[in-house]
Amino acid sequence: MIEADRLIQPQVLAQDEHIDRAMRPKLLDDYTGQDDTRAQLKIFIQAAINRKEALDHMLIFGPPGLGKTTLAMIVANEMGVNIKSTSGPVLEKAGDLAALLTNLDEGDVLFIDEIHRLSPVVEEILYPAMEDYQLDIMIGEGPAARSIKLDLPPFTLIGATTRAGALTSPLRARFGIPLRLEFYNVKDLCTIVTRSAKVMELAIDAGGAHEIAKRSRGTPRIANRLLRRVRDYAEVKFAGEVTEDVAQQALDMLDVDQEGFDYLDRKLLLSIIDKFMGGPVGLDNLAAAIGEDRETIEDVLEPFLIQQGFIQRTPRGRIVTPRAYQHFNIITPDVPK
């Protein structure tokens, strides 16, 4: 399991929730980045409003911390409807889902985070609800049991997942709008950091925002978390304003390097370099070497390292790239031809 105190982990921390809520944009025009996704959503939402219909069911997928929950709330705001939120692991029984569905009004949004973790029993109930706006309920037990159908008002299901491949094919096929969120570029993260600083009434210059943005691993949630810790440093050590120099000092103290890596990223890369001669190394061996589970490596650590060109997945296992050697000032070994 990934350690709970990891500053740059993209999963939401309990202490972040109320602060993140205050920083979330409410409308698409205030939403920064994901330009293609934003443009598509504007069209889909306006078309649904013009037809006075519920928006088609939507699946939002991508690495954690990129704004899937925020986007679901924006959709509800833009459509002018209510949103009810839950998560896959919470819906243990069919009755849990039925209770949510029967309390929806016409056009409402039902948001299910971690939808890939729905139990098969709950998923079966979801199929007719999504397709026909009907709920099949079993009344009674044994020979006296009978099925009744309840009509549901048209609604929009928004599912969010970090593992789209883990969804069953029948469930995935029922989403009319699939949206993939990508890591953010530094320019967009600068805009997000500046906006968040304004919400926090924190003075920050362009250099300070850029320094935080480039170490945020392409993830707004991490950018906002780093901003709060840099603010603490600035208030204690300086007059409170976040400049480039202040941000550099704070982030160096927090052990977040220029690439946005912390000790766990460096541990993974150095394990492949030192213990496995640069790779290839299998996922199970790598997980044992760094003391983490497969899911943490695949879902949390690897996506950013692969996207930034520090690791490659090959049929034989993971290998580090020359860029990883350069990051640690290690001479790249000669590869036998």
UniProtKB/Swiss-Prot annotation:
Major subcellular site: cytoplasm
E.C. number(s) listed in UniProt: 3.6.4.-
Gene3D superfamilies xref list: 1.10.8.60, P-loop containing nucleotide triphosphate hydrolases, Winged helix-like DNA-binding domain superfamily/Winged helix DNA-binding domain
Compartment(s) where it occurs, according to its Swiss-Prot or TrEMBL record: Cytoplasm
SMART domains assigned: AAA
SUPFAM superfamilies with a match to the protein in the record: P-loop containing nucleoside triphosphate hydrolases, Winged helix' DNA-binding domain
Catalytic activity: ATP + H2O = ADP + phosphate + H(+)
A cellular component term, taken from the record's GO annotations: cytoplasm
Ranges in coiled-coil conformation: none
A Gene Ontology molecular function term of the record: four-way junction DNA binding
Residues at which Mg(2+) binds: T69
Region (Head domain (RuvB-H)): 258-337
UniProt keyword list: ATP-binding, Cytoplasm, DNA damage, DNA recombination, DNA repair, DNA-binding, Hydrolase, Nucleotide-binding
Region (Small ATPAse domain (RuvB-S)): 185-255
Binding annotation for ATP: R24, G65, K68, T69, T70, E131, D132, Y133, R174, Y184, R221
Record's function text: The RuvA-RuvB-RuvC complex processes Holliday junction (HJ) DNA during genetic recombination and DNA repair, while the RuvA-RuvB complex plays an important role in the rescue of blocked DNA replication forks via replication fork reversal (RFR). RuvA specifically binds to HJ cruciform DNA, conferring on it an open structure. The RuvB hexamer acts as an ATP-dependent pump, pulling dsDNA into and through the RuvAB complex. RuvB forms 2 homohexamers on either side of HJ DNA bound by 1 or 2 RuvA tetramers; 4 subunits per hexamer contact DNA at a time.
Assembly and oligomerization: Homohexamer. Forms an RuvA(8)-RuvB(12)-Holliday junction (HJ) complex. HJ DNA is sandwiched between 2 RuvA tetramers; dsDNA enters through RuvA and exits via RuvB. An RuvB hexamer assembles on each DNA strand where it exits the tetramer. Each RuvB hexamer is contacted by two RuvA subunits (via domain III) on 2 adjacent RuvB subunits; this complex drives branch migration. In the full resolvosome a probable DNA-RuvA(4)-RuvB(12)-RuvC(2) complex forms which resolves the HJ.
Recorded domain comment: Has 3 domains, the large (RuvB-L) and small ATPase (RuvB-S) domains and the C-terminal head (RuvB-H) domain. The head domain binds DNA, while the ATPase domains jointly bind ATP, ADP or are empty depending on the state of the subunit in the translocation cycle. During a single DNA translocation step the structure of each domain remains the same, but their relative positions change.
HAMAP family cross-referenced by the UniProt entry: DNA_HJ_migration_RuvB
Name this protein carries in UniProt: Holliday junction branch migration complex subunit RuvB
Source organism of the structure: Shewanella denitrificans (strain OS217 / ATCC BAA-1090 / DSM 15013)
Lineage of origin: Bacteria, Pseudomonadati, Pseudomonadota, Gammaproteobacteria, Alteromonadales
Encoding gene per record: ruvB
